[in-house]
Amino acid sequence: MNIGVIFAGGVGRRMNTKGKPKQFLEVHGKPIIVHTIDIFQNTEAIDAVVVVCVSDWLDYMNNLVERFNLTKVKAVVAGGETGQMSIFKGLEAAEQLATDDAVVLIHDGVRPLINEEVINANIKSVKETGSAVTSVRAKETVVLVNDSSKISEVVDRTRSFIAKAPQSFYLSDILSVERDAISKGITDAIDSSTLMGMYNRELTIVEGPYENIKITTPDDFYMFKALYDARENEQIYGM
């Protein structure tokens, strides 16, 4: 069984939106979160989707599920105090749906330019290696800095990747790590791959497209709209 856990828990402070979290902003009559879920909905290998949502917007999210006929969404749950805790709540909900050896794909609700090919590659990688971290090769040189903002290391670009999403694992593995971490007071890991790395779990890269952006700022929003329009034009004009 393959389950998508889609995190839509942010409130969009960096987007400067008033009243509506960024994941609910609309592009061509459809909220960003729905654009994202649609990809999972239309991927044959995905059996179910869990959405983790801002608690005040649960009813709104449930209405979207019904309005856009998102039949693979089997649960909409409230997020936690941190991103990690929100994902944990989604994983717990997935556990209620899962069969043995379930694969979970943890994805950002504001990454709507994911595609079926990457989703399938994640599932394949988990079954072969136990993990999949969707990533892109660094286009520019990555540097590490010290506390004085001085460069302490220039990283070899040929070995540098940028981690994105989905980040995928066997559900039992990521839940085991999450529960142990929480029991030790670790509740604010930046993402699931970071947490698994803290536990020395082997992480495998799955290369994804550069356009798999996370919509965090107004610039990201307009970039998504431009890329979405370009995709639509390709289909219309047969480009």
Curated annotation (Swiss-Prot):
Pathways per UniProt: Cell wall biogenesis; poly(ribitol phosphate) teichoic acid biosynthesis
InterPro entries: IspD/TarI, ISPD_synthase_CS, Nucleotide-diphossugar_trans, TarI
Keyword Transferase included in the entry's annotation: yes
Gene Ontology CC terms, in alphabetical order: cytosol
Pfam family, one: IspD
Catalytic activity, as annotated: D-ribitol 5-phosphate + CTP + H(+) = CDP-L-ribitol + diphosphate
Alphabetized UniProt keyword annotations: Cell wall biogenesis/degradation, Nucleotidyltransferase, Teichoic acid biosynthesis, Transferase
Enzyme category, top tier: transferase
Residues carrying the site annotation Positions ribitol 5-phosphate for the nucleophilic attack: R157, K214
Gene Ontology MF term list: D-ribitol-5-phosphate cytidylyltransferase activity
Protein residues bound to CTP: F7, A8, G9, G10, G80, E81, T82, G83, Q84, M85, S86
Entry annotated with the keyword Acyltransferase: no
Site, as annotated: Transition state stabilizer: R14, K22
Domain of life, per lineage: Bacteria
GO biological process, one term: poly(ribitol phosphate) teichoic acid biosynthetic process
EC number(s) recorded for this UniProt protein: 2.7.7.40
PANTHER family linked: D-RIBITOL-5-PHOSPHATE CYTIDYLYLTRANSFERASE
Function as written in the Swiss-Prot or TrEMBL entry: Catalyzes the transfer of the cytidylyl group of CTP to D-ribitol 5-phosphate.
Family in the record: Belongs to the IspD/TarI cytidylyltransferase family. TarI subfamily.
Protein name: Ribitol-5-phosphate cytidylyltransferase
Source organism of this protein record: Streptococcus agalactiae serotype III (strain NEM316)
